[in-house]
């Protein structure tokens, strides 16, 4: 099911788009009037606008955590494996320059040192 915030954002965008017909704009106005023109949560940032600062606090209050996906040990180990694999692949990829390969090797050594 579509996110109500996205639906509202789409109708708001239609109102400010000069390429949208007056008929479509009127339907958008009607929808926003019937369903409310304010979305409870923002859908992210667009064109450099900042998301509502209160959103994270509201989500925490409602029981949604803001835990980083790599905070638990299993996920952290999996991520580390992906990082190591990426550096190894860069070291053996013929399209990567010698400088890039050396840099990947240095970073791989750093990652290995940190994981010990």
Swiss-Prot record:
GO terms for cellular component: cytoplasm; cytosol; nucleus. Residues 32-116 are annotated as: Disordered. Residues 49-64 have a biased composition (Basic and acidic residues). The keyword Cytoplasm applies. Keywords: Cytoplasm, Nucleus. Residues 39-48 have a biased composition (Polar residues). Coiled coil: none annotated. The keyword Cytoplasm applies. It comes from the Eukaryota. Its main location: cytoplasm. It is found in: Cytoplasm; Nucleus. Belongs to the UPF0654 (con-6) family. This is UPF0654 protein C869.09. It comes from Schizosaccharomyces pombe (strain 972 / ATCC 24843) (Fission yeast).
